[in-house]
Amino acid sequence: MAGNGPINKEDPLNWGAAAAEMAGSHLDEVKRMVAQFREPLVKIQGATLRVGQVAAVAQAKDAAGVAVELDEEARPRVKASSEWILNCIAHGGDIYGVTTGFGGTSHRRTKDGPALQVELLRHLNAGIFGTGSDGHTLPSETVRAAMLVRINTLLQGYSGIRFEILEAITKLLNTGVTPCLPLRGTITASGDLVPLSYIAGLITGRPNAQAISPDGRKVDAAEAFKLAGIEGGFFTLNPKEGLAIVNGTSVGSALAATVMFDANILAVLSEVLSAVFCEVMNGKPEYTDHLTHKLKHHPGSIEAAAIMEHILAGSSFMSHAKKVNEMDPLLKPKQDRYALRTSPQWLGPQIEVIRAATKSIEREVNSVNDNPVIDVHRGKALHGGNFQGTPIGVSMDNARLAIANIGKLMFAQFSELVNEFYNNGLTSNLAGSRNPSLDYGFKGTEIAMASYCSELQYLANPITNHVQSAEQHNQDVNSLGLVSARKTLEAVDILKLMTSTYIVALCQAVDLRHLEENIKSSVKNCVTQVAKKVLTMNPTGDLSSARFSEKNLLTAIDREAVFSYADDPCSANYPLMQKLRAVLVEHALTSGDAEPEASVFSKITKFEEELRSALPREIEAARVAVANGTAPVANRIVESRSFPLYRFVREELGCVFLTGEKLKSPGEECNKVFLGISQGKLIDPMLDCLKEWNGEPLPIN
């Protein structure tokens, strides 16, 4: 643990340690984060708390979920700082917040330290809670995280507070008794004074103090103590103890930690989904080639490209896409659009920002962030400004912008996916029905995505440039750390909405590609059979040269998008029949066959009549086979590295292939995925997509 002692000559300014924290891949860091999140016990020592642990305690209801344990080795140093305060006062020492007033009125003096702490809590209990649905209470998850982080800070022994108070707050955590804190009212410098004063208010038994019981009831301080098993009655605070609890950044940094846990997972998920986007769009995977990204030097982009490259290298879709893209190359764009082709370059900087913000927040939750700092070894009370939560405000502003940019890319990809002019042969709006005139698929969902994205871009605006001078111009610059963290929480929630919607759309596209291949196979089989029946023989009984047109007929089918004709395959207004007829006419005009012209064109007429009779039945049979799971052509997703994600959505969450006929709405399915993401259920399927990745790009051959 960092603390008193000689200056580290090798890294006196801590830049080396900060750089070392960024070693290794972002994915490995996320895996460690998830592992820490799943630990059943969090033992806090003062300087080793991790973002994943904060998120775990926040989400757990009590010790049955995650237990919190104090490091007993911290007891002597905590006791030493508490005793130093009392000894200093006894010898006439003058310490801010102990013998003086607060903030802009610190010129005032008092010898009644305990009474000063009571007044500190009284005047800081300035929050408004409201009632019912209009309430302004901080979510219990955030309060639990704040309690954990505050204990961690105070455990370092620089704050002048008794160990017994930290034990009491820990008991509240472990028994699921959560103080009620106001949602608003802090500028996170001097720390989160107003919300933290309500934690202090509960342990001192203030009459307005309330808590949420394990069964969700609001209870007063007395019942809260009883439920938590805290004996000995309420605490009467010694000098400095109230200030130690309230004068710190723990609410802002705690919420920031929980937000960054989710943000890191969503960042990796966005990389995986960009690869799936390439799969369903029949994209060109060369955009992930390592040389391209190596030459640009940015580690975030290099890793994003390598992750996408890994998924695409193990994808059955890509071998099929290669054949599709090699057909008539001069009639197709040479490159994919930016939303796909530059996705590593777009996501990379966002991941770098998110990673840096995470490390900044992790440093903050392990910092001593109150004032004054008690240096027992030198016998000093150091009056400084560690309560200034600027690392939180700036990190949250930066992270929120990165989150908004991830959402912007997701919206761009989604917009291509649902647009038949850009989606390389998928249906308009990803409609899955037989009749596209009665199925508008994801049209409403695209409108919702536009709404989500617009709000997310608005939230990307910074908070920290809206600082107001406060408290008699003593707090004339302040961080707005908790405010920024709250807005980042909103941004993460909206990105979850977008991600959920996008995943449902991608799974729909996967199944449309499966349907497309089966319909195309049925069409080719049907055309082959009809061609053999109609085109093989002349009326004279001789072999007809028209039989040699079969290969060209199949090529014409390959060139035509299945969903451009699947709802009415024999319509003269749709391209399939037009192209097949053109093949036969071209053959008749160029074959030099001695067969009479009338016979040639009668064959074309007969060919089309036979198709009109057989083809709709074959296409319907293909649809039924796909729906029943008996399709002859397997779904390529099964042989792709992205399959774990698809399987989870389809099998575990029970999301279905959407059609207008089923009446199941897109929102119902998106909600299932949203809940899955919010409950952390998507983490393992996401990581399973990357379980074979060795952390390196493919070799440049």
Swiss-Prot record:
Cross-link 5-imidazolinone (Ala-Gly), where in sequence: A189-G191
Pathway participation: Phenylpropanoid metabolism; trans-cinnamate biosynthesis; trans-cinnamate from L-phenylalanine: step 1/1
One term of GO molecular function: ammonia-lyase activity
A Pfam entry, by short name: Lyase_aromatic
Residues forming the catalytic site: Y96
SUBUNIT field: Homotetramer.
Protein name: Phenylalanine ammonia-lyase
